[in-house]
Amino acid sequence: MEGDLINTNKALLPLSWLYGLGVNFRNMLFEMGILKSRSFDVPVISVGNITVGGTGKTPHVEYLIRLLKDNFKVAVLSRGYKRKTHGFLRADKNSTVRDIGDEPFQMKTKFPDITVAVDGKRTRGITQLTSGDSDSQPDVILLDDAFQHRYVKPGINIMLVDYHHLIIYDRLLPSGRLREPVKSKDRADIVIITKCPTDMKPMEYRVITKAMSLYPYQQLFFSTHVYEPLRPVFPKNAKTLGNFKDMNVLLLSGIASPEQMLIDLQERASQITPLSFSDHHNFSQKDIMHINEVFAGLPSPKVIITTEKDETRLLNTEGLSDEVKRSLYVLPVKVSFMLDQEETFNKHIISYVRKNSRNSILAKGKDDNKSKDSDHSGDRPRTISFRNN
């Protein structure tokens, strides 16, 4: 199984032990009530992880937005990583990546009718979102990347685990990728194994389910990434793009884990040149010149493929050559649940929001049509029971 191939640096284990002491002490303060976790009257759903690197948080938050936005007033609260502003900020049509960060900007661009806000202090952010008249208050708040933010006690705590980097085979920072001990998974109400290959065998599901060793109060789901058709970043001058299987592809990415995207694209294109930057990278003019040069050096026919998150940072970047602009395409990604679990997941989320929303009476019964439109496959959900072994 791919999950047990995680490389860790044993030489750094002493530092990991020291780091673990600090993390465990902090968690103990919360468990003892010395540090307080605050609950709110509004339904709060947290999506996050305990590892460094990408686990697919943004696609899963966007899945929840699509699921809820037609029947509830949805707000997303993020810390706005690498933004140039401070404090609480509610996004509007004039907000930029510099104002709110690339991921909140991406969500506000894709879902302009929902509320997107940023604040490093989530309790303050939720208080701001729920203040004022009732008409402006959200029915549900989605916390982006907040599993470790224990000052808020969400109604549903969703933890994401990358199939290719299972936490049960990992170590604490800096020898491994874990930001918290594996036992922190016990705080999750829902655990989702993300980025699963579509051809997973039944034995793999059983092995992972047993290895995760969840409690009866926890639910385990498996999801995979589904790529949508390419679309141009600059549609006005974009060249017509057909099948890119025989084209030279420059894969431009500034995300935490670009390796899986490269592997997935190799099934659709024969010649791929990866050009990777750090996660949330702000492209400098030197970077743009390098991108122009690398792409100019590729033989035709050719295309540049990038991610939705990188698109937000490239749109208003000066210096891209005309050739790059004509050839720059984004590969959108969505989440799809496996094992016919989508309906089970949807009903659980909608039921929680409906029962706890201020507008629960008005919202009652409206989720039926949404469930039909949620693109789930299969006629019957498959339920997995969990036991400690």
Over which residues does each language-model region extend?
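Conserved beta-strand elements of the Class I
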Residues: A75-L77, M159, N248-L252
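A transmembrane-helix-recognition feature enriched in membrane-embedded lipid enzymes
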Residues: M1-D41, Y352, N356, S360
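C-terminal accessory "lid"/substrate-recognition subdomains
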Residues: E2-L5, I167-P301, A363-N389
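Residue-level signal for inorganic ion chemistry
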Residues: L18, T58, M107, D144, ...
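Phosphate/Mg2+-binding loops and adjacent switch elements
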Residues: G80-Q218, F222
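Acidic beta-strand-to-loop metal/phosphate-binding motif
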Residues: K302-K309
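Short, flexible loop segments at boundaries between secondary-structure elements
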Residues: E228, S278-N282, E323-R354
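Walker A (P-loop) phosphate-binding motif
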Residues: N27-K93, T198-D199, N389
